[in-house]
Each structure stands twice: as structure tokens, then as C-alpha cells.
UniProtKB/Swiss-Prot annotation:
InterPro entries: DNA_clamp_sf, Pr_cel_nuc_antig, Pr_cel_nuc_antig_C, Pr_cel_nuc_antig_CS, Pr_cel_nuc_antig_N. Keywords: DNA replication, DNA-binding, Isopeptide bond, Nucleus, Ubl conjugation. This is Proliferating cell nuclear antigen. Belongs to the PCNA family. GO terms for molecular function: DNA binding; DNA polymerase processivity factor activity. It is found in: Nucleus.
Length: 260
């Protein structure tokens, strides 16, 4: 038996919004330590990794490990039936072919009960090696989303150049070129508004903007985003999920010739 209750149910709604446009179906691995998901997108260009720790839920029970094959589109549709203030409970029997979703209003006056059919998914787990990164940039997530959206008007790829004093986002296309430079902030009242850069060596890499725009669907989950970069290995875009875990997106850099 698996049962997880989340008083702040809107977090789960935001998680689905962050995933569903990139991956259509995925295996939710449920264990006593929490819920995790790892999946390549349908074109096998990017990878998503989600962790929701059990201690972040208001109550959590998992008697044995389960692999729940979920259509993210279906789950997103069902979660749209939950109000933003609703308490959400997920429940599955040990060998169930459905996942129950229960939505309760805070005053308990309305309880909605949905059952979603599960899928049989054949999923390969990819090992994600722990890496030391040449450059780690932490910045407001809304600012990152805005930069990706703005530069998408100019070109379909962005060059991210990271140096000690700041990070530059550059795009070029038929219209011309665009550059956005963010300097490391020295004194900011709100930590969430700060731009911080930890750099071992300068990095300059090119990434497809359409994928970065998919990743920014996770912006409502966190006020900050962390970009971790090193030459020739995938960029990691990480959004923390308050007291619960994170969603990480991995995207391999484009090779220079492709970026023109």
C-alpha cells in the first residue's frame, strides 16, 4: 500500500506542469524514502530527474517499492480538477493497475475522488554521475525564464558564457543578435533576487533554446534556479521544490557548427 498526503497540493500541480510538455509518460518510483522519476524526453535529447522526499509530505506510507507507469498528460488533466488550495492524497495498492487521487477542500466540505489507469512501461534507468562543474550560476528563476523567452525571438540557440564577474546569454539569427549580461550581485536584500557565480574556470557553451524554454515551465516551483556547466557535458538546470526535493533537467551542449 502506498499513500502520500500533501496539504499544499498546488506543489503537485506545478510539478506536473513542469514535466508534461517534455515527457508524455514516465515511471514514478515510489519507496519509503519518497517519490522519484527519471526520464528522457521523447526525442532523447534531454533528461528530467525529479525527487520528492517522503518527509516533505504531510503523511506518507509505502509498504513496498512500487513502479507506477503514469501518463503525465492524464495525470495533469486530473490534477486540473483540484483547486489550488486543495489537499491532495495519492494512493495505490501494492499490485494496483490504478492510482487514486483524492482532492479535499481545507474545510473538508468537498472531497473529489479520481482513479487514473496506470500503464505498463519498460523503463531503463540511466546512471547520472556526480560531477564537479566548472561554473555554477544561481539566479532568480523568473529572470532566467525571461532571458530564454526573449532570446528565442532572436535565434534558436543561446551561448552561455560564464566568467568570474558575470554570465552572458547571447543569441543570433536572421534579425540580428541579442546579448544579456548578468553581473554577480554584491548586496541584495532578498537572497532569492541574487545572482551568484561559483567558477573554477570560464565556460562557453551553446544550448537549444526550445529545450530551455521547456525547462522554465518549472519556474513556479522555485524562486531561484541553478545552472551547472562544464565543457562537453550536459548542462544541469535545477529547481528546488520547497523542503521536498528538486527537479533537474539535463541538456547536452550543441556543437558549434550546428549553432549557426
Amino acid at each position: 500500500m502506498f499513500e502520500a498526503r500533501l496539504v499544499q497540493g498546488s506543489i503537485l500541480k506545478k510539478v506536473l506542469e513542469a514535466l508534461k510538455d517534455l515527457i508524455t509518460e514516465a515511471c514514478w518510483d515510489v519507496s519509503s524514502s519518497g517519490i522519484s522519476l527519471q526520464s528522457m524526453d521523447s526525442s532523447h535529447v534531454s533528461l528530467v530527474q525529479l525527487t520528492l522526499r517522503s518527509d516533505g509530505f504531510d503523511s506518507y506510507r509505502c509498504d513496498r517499492n512500487l513502479a507506477l507507469g503514469v501518463s503525465l498528460n492524464s495525470m495533469s488533466k486530473m490534477l486540473k480538477c483540484a483547486g489550488n488550495e486543495d489537499i491532495i492524497t495519492l494512493r495505490a495498492e501494492d499490485n494496483a493497475d490504478t492510482l487514486a487521487l483524492v482532492f479535499e477542500t481545507l474545510n473538508q466540505e468537498k472531497v473529489s475522488d479520481y482513479e487514473m489507469k496506470l500503464m505498463d512501461l519498460d523503463v531503463e534507468q540511466l546512471g547520472i554521475p556526480e560531477q564537479e562543474y566548472s561554473c555554477v550560476v544561481k539566479m532568480p528563476s523568473g529572470e532566467f525564464a525571461r532571458i530564454c523567452r526573449d532570446l528565442s525571438q532572436i535565434g534558436d540557440a543561446v551561448m552561455i558564457s560564464c566568467a568570474k564577474d558575470g554570465v552572458m546569454f547571447s543569441a543570433s539569427g536572421e534579425l540580428g543578435t541579442g546579448n544579456v549580461k548578468l553581473s554577480q550581485t554584491s548586496n541584495v536584500d532578498e537572497e532569492d533576487d541574487a545572482v551568484t557565480i561559483e567558477m573554477n574556470e570560464p565556460v562557453q557553451l551553446i544550448f537549444a533554446l526550445n529545450y530551455l524554454n521547456f525547462f522554465t515551465k518549472a519556474t513556479p516551483l522555485s524562486k531561484t534556479v541553478t545552472l551547472s556547466m562544464s565543457a562537453d557535458i550536459p548542462l544541469v538546470v535545477e529547481y528546488k521544490i520547497a523542503d521536498m526535493g528538486h527537479v533537474k533537467y539535463y541538456l547536452a551542449p550543441k556543437i558549434d557548427e550546428e549553432a549557426s
